[in-house]
From Swiss-Prot:
Organism: Brucella melitensis biotype 2 (strain ATCC 23457)
Native organism taxonomy: Bacteria, Pseudomonadati, Pseudomonadota, Alphaproteobacteria, Hyphomicrobiales
Enzyme Commission code(s) on record: 2.7.7.59, 3.1.4.-
Gene from which the chain derives: glnD
CDD domains hit by this protein: ACT_ACR-UUR-like_2 (cd04899), ACT_UUR-like_1 (cd04900), HDc (cd00077), NT_GlnE_GlnD_like (cd05401)
Co-factor requirement: Mg(2+)
UniProt record similarity statement: Belongs to the GlnD family.
Protein name: Bifunctional uridylyltransferase/uridylyl-removing enzyme
InterPro entries linked to this entry: ACT-like_dom_sf (IPR045865), ACT_dom (IPR002912), HD/PDEase_dom (IPR003607), HD_domain (IPR006674), NT_sf (IPR043519), PII_UdlTrfase/GS_AdlTrfase (IPR013546), UTase/UR (IPR010043)
């Protein structure tokens, strides 16, 4: 790449800048080191730096060249440092008759030494001395560094002679790596050349296995810190898996082992093909473009591609929306595909190291696995062998001879519990074009694939290798469409393909009994559906396969399942079940989290959808796997409790155990049961208490909770307290219950929810009851924060105290909320289309108002307050948060207990709620269902 291609003269004109500084020095009255002169020189250099960076950014926006931009910024820094060092040694601290010790070379090391920089990159410098430091040398180093620091640069530096460099490189792998990237800048070039020769002879030679082992271990540790998967939706572009540092590691290893200076030399050595070199350069260029744009956009060394900057970076790179995918999602898919390419390059280079050269280097094989080189056949035709506990190909042409071997490789690896030899994976990657329609329809290939997918061992591991190699997306093109696809929201932590693989991992863990404490019901049910277990694995692989399309992904996915299942070898009946599961895979989560499970209509409607116990069992396990695989912290005990409740209540309907007694009869039974539990109360007091709650309370609240509430209200009355709260942690459900007894008034729930928000409580559910003597008994469930019940109870009691203070007027709610109403920075990056639905068919007694919008602190308080202002009574509220999006359902009646049936009134309610949610013009709605899970 020539200077002409880089257009370096547009970044900075070195001679013009040098001439300008010389003229300043020649005409100035003060010495070059005087404060006034220093200020003038510093400002001149700052101006050149700012101008060069601005020009580099403009050129990046025009030509899009990431590598070009990195080289331009590096050239800018080289020029400024060269001129600065020249002036330090000739103007500030000149030597007329320098001794041998009064000499040095200025060397770029680390990332700067590699010849590429982003705007905020560190500038790593080595001041290389021939002997010990001298007073002259100290002055030059100090002058250079202070000028660079005053220019606002982050400079890492060391001052060493050659002996010190060699000694430290021998002891410290980080220093060794930095010197591997060393690049001469200015000063004594012979001194630098001496360091290069000694580094090669005394450090590199004979230490290849040691260095490569250290770099691979360092890479693995870095991945663990940044996130094991390359498909985290907020990746670290520099340090994350599949990022820049992985490319650097590959080049360090090859440079150290093959003694090359450029990537192009790897093609001549046969390490990379021309196509793979092109892939390397494209990946490097894209990652540089992303990183340079990030630094320019944020004006800092931002390395994490977080949600709040993804839109701007996507726009800078020129991405546009396509049907089913917005411009950010298209950009991020490209990013993750590049990260995958980096993984492919890692396997290719490791294979070349091991097979072409490593066997001749003593100790090298220890890097990759064991000392043994013993091979054994794995198949009758001898196509596959086991070598060092890894599966390998016996001949380079086995995939071309029989493309089914591309699937058989993974099948044998699963059956024998083997890792994959890098040579086999390299050959596989280079043979992907062999996967065509004939192979996809091949019965043997599909039989092998289904056995891999439903393996009783560790199907996720093998499927992950199939995905990383590109085989899975080629064998199932619909799956290939969602590889590396991200969803631009805060709820989903992984790309779609990564989520599907993690779903399969969760199911395998449940089947092996590894999650029975966390998921007792799923753990039990999996043992009762042995005949249908295969259907669950197939469903989990396919349930999100239609993401990124304009239509509902559940419906489109069901069509894909109907087409693929027969190909996999499923019967028509099994295909029908998988198709139904894919179509309904969000239903159970949505009903459990956003509907009133104490409302009989909810259960009956859900049972009508499910129809059979077999489907109910499969859907429950599917839902658990789906939610749990969304990301860390998404699953919690409260969601588990809701799903179990829905399962057990639906089971009663499907098995004929659901009571058809009239509402009045069930009310009578419940009052009699409570009376029996309060038999030690005086009859007059007991009868008076039983007259307090209305029918809905007795039909909704469990008997144990009714007893607890009775004692709670009795104690409050005896103490003469009109306002009181009670806290009860529920460890397994991961929620804490706060019960509030207070005089009833229309905005009571709004005040309670606002006080909860002000106290930091995250409400997940609320039930509202009134008594015949004008009091309210409200039960609020908040997310658990502490592991121990004692800590959680104390925290909940603090929340309760805030509620009491607000309700009693001791605290001013608006002031408290104002301190917490700043939305999270990441959430500001998203737009959630506000939606309001008013439904009179979901409940026999209540109108259900469902709202969807961008979450913000205090939103629930605002919503409940507005609903009260609209003269509506809230019977229950169900709060579900999906990252930045909230879906709240309110079961309401008018003030005389009737549903809201008047169309004009419904329209007014919608308009007011949409305005509160922030809808444009306050009037947009749509009829789609909320996406309740991944």
């Amino acid at each position: 790449m020539s200077a002409h291609d880089l257009k370096l003269e547009e970044i900075v004109n070195a001679e013009t800048l040098r001439r300008k500084l010389n003229e300043l020095a020649d005409t100035a009255d003060e010495s070059y080191t005087s404060l006034p002169m220093r200020k003038v020189v510093l400002q001149t250099l700052k101006d050149a730096l700012a101008s060069g960076r601005a020009n580099a950014e403009d050129m990046l926006m025009k030509d899009g060249g990431g590598t070009l931009c990195a080289k331009r910024l590096c050239y800018l820094m080289d020029t400024l440092i060269d001129i600065l060092f020249e002036f330090a040694t000739t103007r500030a601290y000149p030597t007329r008759n320098p001794s041998k010790a009064e000499n040095m070379a200025l060397v770029a090391v680390g990332g700067y030494g590699r010849g590429g920089l982003a705007q905020g990159s560190d500038i790593d410098l080595l001041f290389l001395l021939p002997y010990k430091q001298t007073p002259w040398g100290e002055q030059v180093v100090e002058h250079t560094l202070y000028m660079l620091w005053d220019m606002g640069l982050k400079v890492g530096h060391s001052t060493r002679n050659i002996d010190e460099c060699i000694r430290l490189a021998r002891e410290d792998m980080t220093i060794r790596t930095a010197l591997l990237d060393a690049r001469f800048l200015t000063g004594d070039k012979d001194l630098f050349r001496t360091l290069e020769i000694r580094f090669e002879e005394e450090i590199v030679k004979g230490t290849e296995p040691e260095f490569i082992q250290a770099k691979l271990a360092e890479r693995d540790a870095r991945h663990r810190k940044a996130g094991e998967t390359r498909y985290l939706v907020e990746p670290n572009v520099k340090e994350g898996k599949g990022g820049q540092r992985d490319l650097h590691t590959l080049f360090w290893i090859t440079k150290y082992f093959y003694r090359v200076k450029t990537k192009e030399e790897l093609v001549k050595l046969g390490v990379l093909s021309r196509a793979e070199l092109k892939l390397f350069n494209k990946a490097e260029d894209f990652l540089w473009a992303v990183r340079c744009h990030m630094h320019f956009a944020t004006l800092k060394a931002e390395e994490r591609l977080s949600f709040d900057i993804q839109p701007e970076i996507a726009q800078r790179l020129g991405y546009t929306a396509h049907p089913g995918q917005n411009y950010v999602e298209r950009f991020m898919k490209h990013y993750f595909l590049v990260a995958k390419d980096v993984g492919d390059l890692t396997r290719i280079i490791c294979a070349a190291l091991e097979e072409q050269q490593a066997k001749h280097v003593p100790g090298f094989n220890r890097i990759f696995l064991t000392f043994s080189r013993r091979k054994r056949k794995l198949s009758d035709d001898g196509a596959f062998i086991s070598e060092n506990h890894r599966i390998n190909i016996a001949r380079p042409d086995i995939f071309r001879q029989d493309p089914v071997n591309m699937i058989r490789l993974f099948h044998l690896a699963d059956r024998h519990g083997l890792e994959f030899h890098p040579e086999a994976m390299q050959s596989l990657t280079r043979s992907l074009k062999l996967i065509n329609a004939d192979l996809r329809e091949n019965p043997e290939a599909n039989r092998l694939f289904l056995e891999i997918l439903t393996s009783p061992r560790n199907p996720e591991l093998i499927l992950r290798r199939m995905n990383e190699s590109g085989v899975l997306g080629k064998f199932i093109p619909d799956f290939g469409k969602i590889v590396a696809m991200m969803q631009f929201n805060m709820y989903h932590h992984y790309t779609v393909d990564e989520h599907l693989l993690r779903c399969i991992a969760v199911l395998s863990e449940i089947e092996h009994g590894e999650l029975k404490t966390e998921h007792p019901l799923s753990n039990h049910l999996i043992t009762t559906i042995k005949r249908d277990r295969n259907l669950l694995y197939v469903t989990l692989l396919l349930h999100d396969i239609a993401k990124g399309r304009p239509e509902d992904h559940s419906i489109a996915g069901a069509r894909i399942a109907r087409r693929l299942c027969p190909r996999f070898g499923l019967t028509p009946s099994e295909t029908e079940t998988v198709e139904w599961l894919v179509r309904e895979h969000l239903t159970m989560s949505m009903v459990a989290q956003s509907r009133d499970l104490n409302d009989r209509k909810t259960i009956i409607d859900f049972a009508d959808t499910v129809q059979t116990m077999e489907r109910l069992k499969l859907l429950l396990i599917l839902t658990v796997c789906d939610i749990k695989a969304v990301g860390p912290g998404i699953w919690n005990g409260w969601k588990g409790q809701l799903l179990r409740t829905l399962f057990y209540e639906t089971e009663l309907v499907l098995t004929g155990g659901f009571s058809e007694l009239s509402r009045a009869a069930r009310d009578k039974q419940a009052r009699e049961a409570l009376a029996e539990r309060l038999s030690d109360w005086p009859k007059e007091e007991r009868d008076a208490y039983l007259a307090l709650p209305y029918t809905n309370y007795f039909l909704t609240v469990s008997l144990d909770d009714q007893v607890r509430h009775a004692h709670f209200i009795r104690d409050a009355d005896q103490q003469g307290r009109a306002l009181v709260t009670m806290a009860k942690p529920h460890a397994f459900e991961a929620v804490t219950e706060i019960t509030v007894l207070a005089p009833d008034h229309p905005r009571l729930l709004s005040v309670i929810t606002g006080a909860c928000a002000a106290a930091g409580g995250n409400i997940v559910d609320a039930q509202i009851f009134t008594t015949s003597d004008g009091r309210a008994l409200d039960t609020i469930l908040i997310s658990r924060e502490f592991d121990t019940d004692d800590d959680e109870r104390r925290r909940a009691e603090r929340v309760g105290k805030v509620i009491e203070d607000v309700l009693s007027g001791k605290a001013h709610l608006p002031d408290m909320l104002a301190k917490r109403t700043k939305p999270k920075k990441a959430a500001r990056a998203f737009k959630v289309e506000p939606r309001v639905e008013i439904n009179n068919t979901l409940s026999n007694k209540f109108t259900v108002i469902e709202v969807e919008g961008l979450d913000r602190p205090g939103l629930l308080s605002e919503l409940t307050g507005l609903i009260s202002d609209l003269s509506l009574d809230i019977a229950s509220a169900h709060i579900t948060t999906f990252g930045e999006k909230v879906i709240d359902s309110f079961y309401v009646t008018d003030l005389v207990g009737h549903k809201i049936s008047n169309a004009t009134r419904q329209g007014n309610i919608k308009r007011k709620l949409l305005a509160l949610l922030g809808a444009e013009n306050g009037a947009r709605t749509n009829g789609r269902s909320p996406q309740a899970a991944a």
